[in-house]
């Protein structure tokens, strides 16, 4: 018996239009970033997109994410192509090269077939509006040269700064880019409050407690919408995973004029399945993550407190899985596991074999029904406020 050949991503893209990333013109847009290298969750994302008729960036990773996972933009786009084919996705989907900072980043994203380019000028913004504006111009022009006649969309990321982006600055930047003839599709400001990884939005910390007040966020969002309205620009929200308290506000204020980016907590959903069904493996991952945390947290804004961690060694699998649920109140554990994803996924034994990755995928495959159910429910929590009534 001859085994059928598994088609390569490039072969699929050459043959089937639905497996190629495309420009997304309809809104809202959902960024379904997926960090793990084994596609299982990416396929579920594609199925959810098909079922609920979503506009998705099925391929979405930042430069930081691909560096930490040892992948490339091409790997991410190829995973999305294979996932779209496996899920029989017929809706258009996009590929987002996220947080691009250098010409090399842009070239890699263009070569991989990305259709959406997120330019991170947070560093330049700290030097002044002129520096940020100049950097955007250079990046957009390079992308235009490399893409040729192929269409693409653009996004300006201002979110990785210490202070809320002034609405006056947003207006001045958009006016400048319009005068320069630069096609700006989206803008991602630094909003009031905190969009920390793996946990819900909060406004500030008082006496060691997170204050979950959304009034200031909503007021800023209303003002931002007024600023961008005349420019035809979409508003993008970064680090949008598990920010459940603000989804209804985004839907109410922006209607469909929003691009919500999510990524990291799909990895936590996988750890939830592993905790439930292979507690020894989960504990090993936890111990490794704890050892890596101080190093891996360096590029993230976090408020995790190691003194608030549960006794993982004393809890059984179902109890640990319960602690990994979104909004369960154990934010400290979730943040520590969240930001160490790259170290866990790329860890190697002395002989060069994966320390965790192969065992992780084996558990997920053995418990595919449970994994699929949890992932679908998690995705639905993110998209439900934006679905038609």
PLM region spans:
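Short glycine-rich or small-residue beta-strand-to-loop segments that form or flank ligand, phosphate
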Residues: 153-160
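Residues at beta-strand starts and edge strands
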Residues: 91, 150-152
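Aromatic/His-enriched, Gly/Pro-containing loop or helix-boundary segments
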Residues: 80-82, 89-91, 95-100
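Conserved, mostly hydrophobic/aromatic
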Residues: 98, 156, 238
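Active-site capping/gating regions of soluble enzymes
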Residues: 1-79, 85-87, 103-128, 132, ...
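Hydrophobic "anchor" residues on beta-strands that sit immediately upstream
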Residues: 94, 155, 234
């Amino acid at each position: 018996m001859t085994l059928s050949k598994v088609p390569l991503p490039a072969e699929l893209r050459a043959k089937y239009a639905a497996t190629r990333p495309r420009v997304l013109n309809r809104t809202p847009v959902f960024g379904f970033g997926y960090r793990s290298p084994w596609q299982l969750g990416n396929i579920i994302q594609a199925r959810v997109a098909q079922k609920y008729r979503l506009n998705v960036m099925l391929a979405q990773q930042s430069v930081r994410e691909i560096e930490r996972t040892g992948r490339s933009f091409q790997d991410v786009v190829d995973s999305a192509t294979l996932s779209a084919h496996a899920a029989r996705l017929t809706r258009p989907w996009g590929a987002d090269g996220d947080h691009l900072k250098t010409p090399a980043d842009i070239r890699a994203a263009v070569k991989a077939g990305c259709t959406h380019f997120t330019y991170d000028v947070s560093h330049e913004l700290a030097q002044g509006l002129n520096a940020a504006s100049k950097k955007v111009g250079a990046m957009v022009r390079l992308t235009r040269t490399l893409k040729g006649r192929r269409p693409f969309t653009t996004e300006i990321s201002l979110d990785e700064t210490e202070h809320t982006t002034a609405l006056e600055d947003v207006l001045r930047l958009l006016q400048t880019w319009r005068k320069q003839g630069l096609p700006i599709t989206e803008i991602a400001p630094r909003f009031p409050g905190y969009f920390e990884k793996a946990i819900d939005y909060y406004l500030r910390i008082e006496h060691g407690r997170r204050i979950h007040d959304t009034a200031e966020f909503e007021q800023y969002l209303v003002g931002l919408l007024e600023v961008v309205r005349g420019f035809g620009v979409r508003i993008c929200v970064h680090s949008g995973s598990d920010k459940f308290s603000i989804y209804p506000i985004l839907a109410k204020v922006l209607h469909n004029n929003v691009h919500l980016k999510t990524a990291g907590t799909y990895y936590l959903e996988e750890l939830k399945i592993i905790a439930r069904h292979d507690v020894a493996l989960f504990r090993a991952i936890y111990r490794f993550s704890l050892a890596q945390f101080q190093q891996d947290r360096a590029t993230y804004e976090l408020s995790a407190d190691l003194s608030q961690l549960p006794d993982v060694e004393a809890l059984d699998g179902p109890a640990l899985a319960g602690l990994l649920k979104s909004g369960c109140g154990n934010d400290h554990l979730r943040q520590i596991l969240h930001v160490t994803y790259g170290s866990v996924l790329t860890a190697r034994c002395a002989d060069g074999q994966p320390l965790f990755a192969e065992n992780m995928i084996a558990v997920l495959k053995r418990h595919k029904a449970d994994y699929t159910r949890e992932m679908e429910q998690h995705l639905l929590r993110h998209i439900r406020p934006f679905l038609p009534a």
